[in-house]
Amino acid sequence: MTYKDKVAAITKQFRQTVENKYNIIEMKLFGSFARGDYSKTSDIDLMVRLSKVDRNIEEDLFNIAYDLELEYDCVIDVIVLPQNFDNDIMIYQNVQKEGIAI
């Protein structure tokens, strides 16, 4: 399995797990994988917008990512945003420019 295939499997599994529990507004892969300049040591950057976000939901998403990190021996960084937020946030603008919907 190539690293690109591995990332595809991880993002698919992450999305399926999250959408079985929560109402996803938007989910994107961004960073080096979205730009195509990744290496085998690159982390996997994911942005998730949900209709509702609280501390417990955020912690659950981090735990889902952690389980995948252990399973696939990788690093996953997750940004969790509520449906209504200030979309002037710089990181969100970057995700919108370079992100790939998953």
Where are the regions a protein language model picked out?
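Glycine-rich beta-strand-to-loop/alpha-helix junction loops that act as flexible
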Residues: 30-32
